[in-house]
Amino acid sequence: MEIEGYEKIIEAGKIASKVREEAVKLIXPGVKLLEVAEFVENRIRELGGEPAFPCNISINEIAAHYTPKLNDNLEFKDDDVVKLDLGAHVDGYIADTAITVDLSNSYKDLVKASEDALYTVIKEINPPMNIGEMGKIIQEVIESYGYKPISNLSGHVMHRYELHTGISIPNVYERTNQYIDVGDLVAIEPFATDGFGMVKDGNLGNIYKFLAKRPIRLPQARKLLDVISKNYPYLPFAERWVLKNESERLALNSLIRASCIYGYPILKERENGIVGQAEHTILITENGVEITTK
């Protein structure tokens, strides 16, 4: 069976993997989050890809969906547990990968729990594989370390220019008749926490997605919508990719209110527990499972 876009899938994985390994070395106390995010996104482009979504840098109890805003001054601190989640695409074929950096040196086991869960479940995949059984494996590994998997976060099957296709890979056991099989491109991302084991929505995290073109009164907002719909019709974008200065924020907010764009909320652990994450993209072929972001 020939897999559509195979070479591009593999190339996107190589780019994402290389950038992840380079970016990890930049994460240190006193370094600005913006510096790391811009390095990631620019490096992906240098290597011949495009960011599949804004670089996510989520610290401590934040599990996902924070990217630095325009002129963001936030810096890493020496007790931070940092999740770096990045994606690259080549002609729409996506690679999605994440790693946790423990600057505090107090959460080695938490980091190990999500990593071990990731590699264990990948090793156990035998297509067609029930996604509920995958969740069971992830849950058992994380719980064996004394932590909880985050039950309302999940991995996802990806298509060309589509990060989430409707099939999710749970981090806990679920009774389901959904399977992944040969030809599927899948992001698997176990999250472990010492908190409640669920996330809740926080404020907007500076990441947006185009929804539709609608009539807009404000000329500046119409212009901004044209830029967004032309450049980011399918995949998420960062506010700093489309705003030149703070005065344009009014236009962005009017697009959210008009449901022209969707703003992703930050996802926080429900009891402010510390969160660790590990993620790889896999491609299921007739010859077995390939980790594209290894």
UniProtKB/Swiss-Prot annotation:
GO cellular component annotations of the record: cytoplasm
Reactions accelerated catalytically: Release of N-terminal amino acids, preferentially methionine, from peptides and arylamides
Binding annotation for a divalent metal cation 2: D96, H156, E189, E279
GO MF entries: aminopeptidase activity; initiator methionyl aminopeptidase activity; metal ion binding; metalloaminopeptidase activity; metalloexopeptidase activity
Cysteine disulfide partners in this protein: none
Signal peptide, first to last residue: none
Cofactor(s) needed for function: Co(2+); Zn(2+); Mn(2+); Fe(2+)
Residues given in the record as substrate binding sites: H65, H164
Binding site for a divalent metal cation 1: D85, D96, E279
Family in the record: Belongs to the peptidase M24A family. Methionine aminopeptidase archaeal type 2 subfamily.
UniProt cross-references to PANTHER family, sorted A to Z: METHIONINE AMINOPEPTIDASE 2
HAMAP family for this protein: MetAP_2_arc
Name of protein: Methionine aminopeptidase
Source organism per UniProt: Methanocaldococcus jannaschii (strain ATCC 43067 / DSM 2661 / JAL-1 / JCM 10045 / NBRC 100440) (Methanococcus jannaschii)
Taxonomy of the source species: Archaea, Methanobacteriati, Methanobacteriota, Methanomada group, Methanococci
